[in-house]
């Protein structure tokens, strides 16, 4: 697939990117090569390849989902400058 300079400019505009006019042709050439490679990948016969979610057959060992810390909300709020109804009060930043 070959991209024109106009198509590169349109893609850049849609992506809100600024491209120098002297680099548009180089981008068109590079993007065309990338798209050609993607087309080449799409033409590979993968009918005999087994689908997989992960290339390794190992499973990740996860720790048990146990509560390891106690509720320290009262302690933390005791150190806060301003607390009301269990909420931290902070100065207004935006008017």
From Swiss-Prot:
It catalyses: L-glutamyl-tRNA(Gln) + L-glutamine + ATP + H2O = L-glutaminyl-tRNA(Gln) + L-glutamate + ADP + phosphate + H(+); L-aspartyl-tRNA(Asn) + L-glutamine + ATP + H2O = L-asparaginyl-tRNA(Asn) + L-glutamate + ADP + phosphate + 2 H(+). Its EC number is 6.3.5.-. GO terms for biological process: glutaminyl-tRNAGln biosynthesis via transamidation; regulation of translational fidelity; translation. Gene3D superfamilies: Glu-tRNAGln amidotransferase C subunit, N-terminal domain. It is an enzyme of class 6 (ligase). InterPro entries: Asp/Glu-ADT_sf_sub_c (IPR036113), GatC (IPR003837). Keywords: ATP-binding, Ligase, Nucleotide-binding, Protein biosynthesis. GO terms for molecular function: asparaginyl-tRNA synthase (glutamine-hydrolyzing) activity; ATP binding; glutaminyl-tRNA synthase (glutamine-hydrolyzing) activity. It comes from the Bacteria. The keyword Glycoprotein does not apply. Belongs to the GatC family. Allows the formation of correctly charged Asn-tRNA(Asn) or Gln-tRNA(Gln) through the transamidation of misacylated Asp-tRNA(Asn) or Glu-tRNA(Gln) in organisms which lack either or both of asparaginyl-tRNA or glutaminyl-tRNA synthetases. The reaction takes place in the presence of glutamine and ATP through an activated phospho-Asp-tRNA(Asn) or phospho-Glu-tRNA(Gln). Heterotrimer of A, B and C subunits. This is Aspartyl/glutamyl-tRNA(Asn/Gln) amidotransferase subunit C. The lineage of its organism: Bacteria, Pseudomonadati, Pseudomonadota, Gammaproteobacteria, Methylococcales. The gene is gatC.
């Amino acid at each position: 697939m070959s991209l024109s300079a106009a198509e590169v400019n349109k893609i850049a505009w849609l992506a809100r990117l600024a491209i120098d006019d002297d680099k548009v042709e180089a981008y068109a050439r590079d993007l065309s090569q990338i798209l050609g490679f993607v087309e080449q990948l799409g033409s590979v016969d993968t009918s005999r390849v087994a689908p997989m979610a992960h290339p390794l057959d190992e499973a990740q060992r996860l720790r048990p989902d146990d509560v390891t810390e106690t509720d320290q909300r009262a302690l933390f709020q005791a150190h806060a400058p301003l607390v009301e109804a269990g909420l931290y009060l902070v100065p207004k930043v935006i008017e």
